Amino acid sequence: MGLVPLDSEEPPMDMERIINRVTDKQHLGPDAQVDDKALVFVPSDPALTDPFLALVEDWFSKPGFEWHPHRGLETVTTVVDGVLEHGDNLGHAGALEPGEVQWMTAGRGIIHRELAYRDEHAHVLQMWLNLPAAKKLTPSRYQDLTRAAMPRIETPGVRIDVHAGTVDGVTGAADTHHPVQGLVATLDPESSYTLQVPPEHRLFAYVMNGRLLIAGRELHAGRTGWSDPVESPAPTTLHLMATDPDHPARVMIYSGTPLREPVALGGPFVMNTKDEIAQAFTDFHGGTFGPVPRTARLAYDR
C-alpha cells in the first residue's frame, strides 16, 4: 500500500441535514377578514424559529386585509391560488397571480392592504421574516417577484421556483437584508431532489400538498419540518423525495441565518424592546407612517 502525501487532503464531504422537530398546522376557520385561516407556525418561542417569525395560510374573498401598519419586519406573501391585489401608502400597487410573491420590507413604517382581486378569491401563504436590529428602521420597500422575474430549476420530475438566495447556481430575484434562501418545489410522484443549505442556516420545510420524505422523515400536507444550524466546514444537504405513488408533492422551504437578538412583538410591529413597540404605536397614531390612502380598487390589466 502506497503512502498518501500529507498535502493531498480531500475536501470535506457535505453533511446531511436532519429534522430536529415537526410542527402541525393549526386550523382556525373563518373570521371577520377571511373565509378560512390556518397558522402554519407562530412565534410562541422565537428562538426556535429565528429568523422566521410566523407563517399563516389565508383564504379570502371579501373583505381581506384592509389598510393596516407594519414596522420592523418583512412580510413575504406567496400566492397559492387566485389573484392578490395589494397597495401601500407609498404609492405602490399591483396584483399577483398564483406562484408569484410579494416581498415587503416594512422597515421604519408602512401602511398597506391585501385584497382578493374583485373580491373573487385569494389563497395565500404569508411569512413574517424578522429584520436585524440595525435594519429595523430601514426605508420601506416592495419587491414583486412575478413569474417573468422568477427563475425556475427543472430536473426530471422536479420544478423549483427560487424566491431568494442561490439554489444550484440559480439566484432568486429577492434582495434580502440578511442571508435567506427560499423556494417552492413541486415533485412528481416518487421523484427526488437534494438541496444544498448553508450550515449556519435554520431551515423550515412546509408541506403544502402531498407526502414527502424530508431528511429521512415522512411528512404529509400541513406539517412543517425544522432543521437547526450545524457546525460543518462544508455545505449541508437536505434530501427530498415524494412518497405518494399517485400524487405530486409541493413544499415551501426557507432557510436563513438566525439573528440571535431579542424579539418584542406588538400587534403588527416587531422590534427588540417593549419601549420600541410603544414608540411604534405612538408614531403610527401620530401620523409618522403617513396618511391612510383613500385610493380606488385596481384596474387589473396584467
Stretch-by-stretch model annotation:
Residues 1-302:
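Jelly-roll (double-stranded beta-helix
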